[in-house]
Amino acid sequence: MTRAVAEDLASSLEPDYRILHVLTTGGLEDLMDAIKTARKSEVDLLIGVGGGKPLDITKILAAELGVRYVVVPTSASHDGIASPSVSFTLSREIEERFGRVIRVEAPTAILADTTIINRASPITFKSGFGDLVAKITAVRDWELAYKLRDEPYSEYAASMSLLSAKIAMDHAHEIRTRLEESTRILVKALIGSGVAMSIAGSSRPASGSEHMFSHALDILSSEAGVKPAPHGIQVAIGTIMMAYLQGQDWKMIKEKLIEAGVPTTAEEAGISPDMIVKALTIAHKIRERYTILGSSGLTLSAAEKLARVTGVIK
């Protein structure tokens, strides 16, 4: 579907603009080739069409070329649509491979056609909902870092991030139906989360211990040679457990996730119980970000107890 959308968009622009097509799988070699091709062609504006990886590639290309970019999302699976950041995994790969961090900007414009987005796989909607609910624990982690580590904190950005989560949770049942109006609600909330990150100047309003848990799962999945669960699904499961540690109403969060059709157990998400527990024990090491996990993290027994008491594993 993504390619068809991109081709339709290019056809509508070609009478007035010179179009350079760049198709990429999202690998680092493809990224470097795309940068070289774009530089030779004196590109003025980039248009990213697709889900998470194509939009991340567009952001990096725009940063490297020093040009503006527009995004055309074809799914509502994550809050990176409007954010001034790329996925943690891709950012880490680039830093390890090239020894530097690429700073990206938020898009100049977002063209989100809900008719197109509504055709995406049902799991993308569940993933997007899970990514939004995660703001509840992310903001609490941010508040904790502000109080204990004097980390910069924006009440405005935090409030906007929590509002995005609230909007999604208030419409959990409608979002599960995937009617076009509910898709519009989900997309607006995801964009709102991205704007909150732009205001804060970091991903703090949207990413805390629950995302670190998800990143840990990504690493363990890669090491085991298995495909990880969708980002928002992993984050949703992490949110349930981190909310428990934070003393928040984790049962209400779990109920809303279930109402939206989001997997809330390791079995439903296709993740092994052992991997869930292992990810909990290493999540605090994933990045330099203070959260409810503290600097020492969870012991193996504490991690297993947490996963069991919240019903994530049996």
Curated annotation (Swiss-Prot):
Q: Name one GO biological process term.
A: glycerophospholipid metabolic process
Give the signal peptide range: none
Pathway(s) of this molecule:
Membrane lipid metabolism; glycerophospholipid metabolism
Localization: Cytoplasm
Query: Could you tell me the gene encoding this protein?
Result: egsA
Gene3D superfamilies, per the entry = 3.40.50.1970, Dehydroquinate synthase-like - alpha domain (1.20.1090.10)
Organism encoding this protein = Korarchaeum cryptofilum (strain OPF8)
Task: Extract one GO molecular function annotation from the record.
Answer: glycerol-1-phosphate dehydrogenase (NADP+) activity
Q: Function, please?
A: Catalyzes the NAD(P)H-dependent reduction of dihydroxyacetonephosphate (DHAP or glycerone phosphate) to glycerol 1-phosphate (G1P). The G1P thus generated is used as the glycerophosphate backbone of phospholipids in the cellular membranes of Archaea.
| Cofactor(s) for this UniProt protein | Zn(2+)
**Per UniProt, where does substrate bind?**
79, 131, 215
**GO CC: one term?**
cytoplasm
Sorted alphabetically, the keyword list is: Cytoplasm, Lipid biosynthesis, Lipid metabolism, Metal-binding, NAD, NADP, Oxidoreductase, Phospholipid biosynthesis, Phospholipid metabolism, Zinc
Cofactor: binding details: Binds 1 zinc ion per subunit.
Record's protein name: Glycerol-1-phosphate dehydrogenase [NAD(P)+]
